[in-house]
């Protein structure tokens, strides 16, 4: 980049079409966040009306994560074959329909199924919107593109909390889900008014890629076996999270079965680069395990342990959600300045200083609690805004939407486990202690996985012939592609 270009403010590097593409995707992600977090806000009301245990109620949050891996795969492949725009519109329609169905749900099973539909739509929205914006913006601004986009989810959560405080006390919890149908109108507007992503257009010129992940898995020579494994994974996840299994050994066996199936899919679809894909799933798994206990159960903690009324809960959640949204934007600037991995590690380390005080302070001073949550979520949750850029850099354009969608949403099963683990621990400890302990300990795992660039490192150990040495999105070198002590300029850029 020339000196003259560097002196131009970053936002002047973007034209009107690129800003319009971002605005449309950001609004879609805001609506996604709004619809997705509604269940967390009304969890106690739903639990009381349906007569659910705490673990059953938490499984309604988990349900959306169970179907995400399949939604990420299918809608991601749609984005790779037909373009990012169509996949994004389809995703919005799916999660909106699921939200409306929640409002009509007569009982636990019906609502669980509706949450499965929401999960599929959410997964598609994540993969398609992220690749759409990242591929539409200049390479040197793509951490900002990722961070700014993901902030929309947190803003959606803030809006949902405010709507909750106005709607639920007057019209009840079902009315909140009826509002979630509005995004379908937005989806119809999107279909006609936004351009296709630049990278996808340049790569294909209107032609479909040779093979997507769906082609490989469900139209290839192993299609029958893969369909059977897909059904087996869906059944196993159903029994793990909705079957009320009491035997931990059976749950563990079913979990290992699912892991084996997902690894098999990754090996088939990515070939020699499967170690990278598997490690990306592990990174995302632990990212959800450290962050989602708080995301999912914070409203319950505020209402039960701290005995806050709905208005106070909404105020505290505003600080939390707004902090995460600001953190996504800050993370985008940090990522373009320090580099994606270094920014991630520094932000998580800083967040560790705040997690214990958040749950130790109690509920006497709402404003202090709100400020602590703002900064903790800004540093700990907000930095996840650059996670799509981090993951997408390991995939070529042909498989980026499906690769990002599948790896991210398989790892997102950590979000399904997180609230249930938190609820189980809370049966022996108070909920605040359980949430703080989980988040504090598991954040360090993520710091190590990202800081050491374990996807590249494990790829180098197991299948070095397929090692990617540079980020496919911004061209920067992967630190894990060389042994410790090796010079970065020894790296040779690869295409695969």
Swiss-Prot record:
Catalysed reaction equations from the record: N-acetylneuraminate(in) + H(+)(in) = N-acetylneuraminate(out) + H(+)(out)
The keyword Cell membrane is assigned to this record: yes
GO cellular component terms listed in the entry, alphabetical order: plasma membrane
Localization: Cell inner membrane
Pfam families: MFS_1 (PF07690)
Bilayer-spanning residue ranges: 22-42, 58-78, 92-112, 116-136, 148-168, 170-190, 224-244, 247-267, 278-298, 313-333, 353-375, 406-426, 431-451
Entry-linked InterPro entries: MFS, MFS_dom, MFS_trans_sf, SA_transporter
PROSITE patterns given in the database record: MFS
Topology of this chain in the membrane: Multi-pass membrane protein
Gene3D superfamilies per the UniProt record, alphabetical: MFS general substrate transporter like domains (1.20.1250.20)
UniProt GO molecular function: carboxylic acid transmembrane transporter activity; sialic acid:proton symporter activity
Principal location: membrane
Keywords: Cell inner membrane, Cell membrane, Membrane, Sugar transport, Transmembrane, Transmembrane helix, Transport
Family (UniProt): Belongs to the major facilitator superfamily. Sialate:H(+) symporter (SHS) (TC 2.A.1.12) family.
HAMAP family per UniProt: MFS_NanT (MF_01238)
Record's function text: Catalyzes the proton-dependent transport of sialic acid.
Record's protein name: Sialic acid transporter NanT
Source species taxonomy: Bacteria, Pseudomonadati, Pseudomonadota, Gammaproteobacteria, Enterobacterales
